[in-house]
Amino acid sequence: MTTILQLSDLHLFADPDAVLFGIPTRRTLRDVLAHIEASGLQPHHVVVTGDHTHDELPETYADVRELLTPFLDRLHQVPGNHDDRARLREGFSDRIGGTGAERITFSFEADGWLCLGLDTHIPGEVGGRIGPEQIEWVRSRVGERQPRGVVLFMHHPPVELGVAWLDRIGVEDRAALQELLAEEPRIRLVSCGHVHHESSHRVGGAEVVTVPSTGLQFSPLSQEAEFVAAPPGYRIIELHGDICATSVVRLPEALFTPVQPPAEL
C-alpha cells in the first residue's frame, strides 16, 4: 500500500508573526506538522497543492522548505495563485525541474497507479487555467503508462462547488478536464486545494475532492466570502491494488478565530 499526504494553502509570510485574517499561518502549519508526526503517519509521498506562501518572497520559500525538511526526499509540488513559479522553483531546485516561470508539474508512479500534478496558475490572477497542453499531457501519460488507476493533483478544483464567490475564482476551462474525466475511467481521484475546506464531487468515474488549508478556513456554506473558526487539516490518500481511499484529518480544535474579510473580496 502507498500512502500520500496532501498539504495545501500554507500561506506563509516572511514575517514569522504575520497573520492572514487573524490566523498565524506559520504557527498553524507547525501545529499540523506536529500532529502528523505524533500520529505516526509515514507517508511514501507528500504533495503540496499550492499557495506555499502568501507574500511570494524568496525568504518565505526558504522557510517553507525548512519546515518541510522531513519530507524533502518525497515531496511533489504544484503552484497556487499565491505562488511565484520562478521563486518556488528556485527554493526547491532539487525537487522541481525546468527553468524560470515555466509550468510546474510532476509525475510519479506508486503500486501501479500514476499520480500527476497539474499547474493551474495564471500569473497575476486569482482564478486558474489548465490549458489544452496539460489535458493532452494527461491523456498521453495515461496512454503510455497504462496504469491501474490515476490520481490528479492541482490547486484550483475543476468543478463548481455551489459556493458563488469561490466558483468565480475557479478554473476557467474546467469543462475540458471534465470531458477527460468522463472519457477516461482510470482517473479515479482529483485532489485540489484553493478553497480552504473539504468537499467531494463526482465527475464521470472520478471523485473530485478539496482539502482544508493548514491555516485559514473558508465557509463552505456562504455564497460570499466568509471565514470560519475550524481546525486546520490535511488529506491522506491510500492506494492499494485497485482501491483508492481518501480521508481528511483535522486537528482536534481551532485555536484561533479569523477576522472576517472586507465586503469587496
Located regions from the model:
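Extended active-site neighborhood of metal-dependent phosphoesterases/phosphodiesterases
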Residues: 57-144, 173-186, 204, 212, ...
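N-terminal active-site segment of His-dependent metallophosphoesterases
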Residues: 1-63
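His/acidic metal-ligating clusters that form di-metal
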Residues: 31-45, 128-207, 244-245, 260-264
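A short acidic, helix-capping loop that chelates divalent metal ions and anchors anionic groups
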Residues: 13-19, 86, 124-127, 160-164, ...
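A short C-terminal boundary segment appended to hydrolase-like catalytic domains
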Residues: 235-265
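Active-site neighborhood of phospho(di)ester-bond hydrolases with catalytic His/Asp-centered motifs
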Residues: 6-8, 45-51, 75-81, 119, ...
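Active-site-proximal beta-strand elements of phosphoester/diester hydrolases
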Residues: 2-14, 112-122, 151-153, 206-212, ...
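Short glycine-enriched, charge-decorated loop/helix-capping segments at active-site entrances
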Residues: 18-24, 94, 124, 163-169, ...
